[in-house]
Regions:
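C-terminal output/interaction extensions
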Residues: 107-125, 129
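Context-gated lysine
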Residues: 5-6, 55, 102, 109-110, ...
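C-terminal structural segments of small proteins and small subunits
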Residues: 92-110, 114
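Conserved binding/recognition cores within well-folded domains
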Residues: 2-93, 97
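N-terminal regulatory/sensing modules of transcriptional regulators
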Residues: 1-9, 121-130
Length: 130
């Protein structure tokens, strides 16, 4: 996996994965979610879906600290695309809904709240710099 960093920032902009379709660089902010389907994982972006034969646990480690949360044993979601979480359902900006299991619900909700508060702080810093 190759990592590409943004200029003058520590944030990762894109990651290269060995998909079935070939080695492809995926911009982190375009990856909506990763879903397990049998023995492969599907990377859903706005444009298309890519498949890879790799454990979701491995993918989760690679995306750690980049705004993704494991909401289900089969789903890893980019929190930038979560509109809201309520009544054990994760509502995405794309209109899709993913069930959140009852035991994971408090963890997922807390991670999303932390993400929102950190995103708010980042926006405050940008406004102060302008």
């Amino acid at each position: 996996m190759a990592v590409v960093k943004k200029d003058n920032e520590n944030a990762v902009e894109a990651l290269r994965f060995p998909f079935v379709e070939g080695s492809i660089l995926i911009a982190v902010d375009t990856l909506i979610y990763v879903e397990t389907d049998r023995h492969r994982n599907l990377f859903h972006t706005a444009d298309r879906t890519y498949s890879i034969y790799r454990k979701l646990d491995e993918i989760e480690r690679q995306l750690d600290g980049l705004g993704f949360v494991r909401i289900h044993r089969s789903f890893l979601v980019n929190m930038r695309y979560i509109r809201r979480i309520s009544s054990y359902i994760c509502y995405l900006n794309t209109g899709e809904q993913i069930s959140v299991p009852k035991p994971r619900y408090p963890y997922v909700k807390k991670q999303f709240e932390l993400f929102l508060s950190n995103a708010g702080e980042a926006e405050d810093v940008k406004e102060m710099e302008a």
